[in-house]
Amino acid sequence: MSKSVTVDRVKVIAEMAKQNITGEELAQKAGVGRSAVQKMRKGQAVWRTTAGHVAAALGVSVESLMEQ
């Protein structure tokens, strides 16, 4: 199993907009660095655990943010 995952940037951005949360606010809520949230918003690979923290902070599953 890969230690990194790539999420669908559109899904991340849409969920952030739906919840009216900024990248900085999401990073703080998830306990990750702003750069990790920025990578996810750009569709770049991040550590699986980081994606899990961000998904949990958004109240969604990692799978719902994954590219399909």
What are these model-predicted stretches?
Residues 26-27, 54:
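Short alpha-helical "recognition helix" segments of helix-turn-helix
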Residues 18, 29, 57:
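Residues within the alpha-helical elements of helix-turn-helix
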Residues 1-25:
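A short, Lys/Arg-rich alpha-helix, primarily the initiator
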Residues 43-56:
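Short, basic-rich loop-to-helix N-cap that marks the start of a DNA-contacting helix
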Residues 25, 36, 64:
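Residues in the helix-turn-helix
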Residues 59-68:
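Short C-terminal boundary/hinge segments that cap the last helix of small helical domains
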Residues 31-46:
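Recognition helix of helix-turn-helix/homeodomain-like DNA-binding domains
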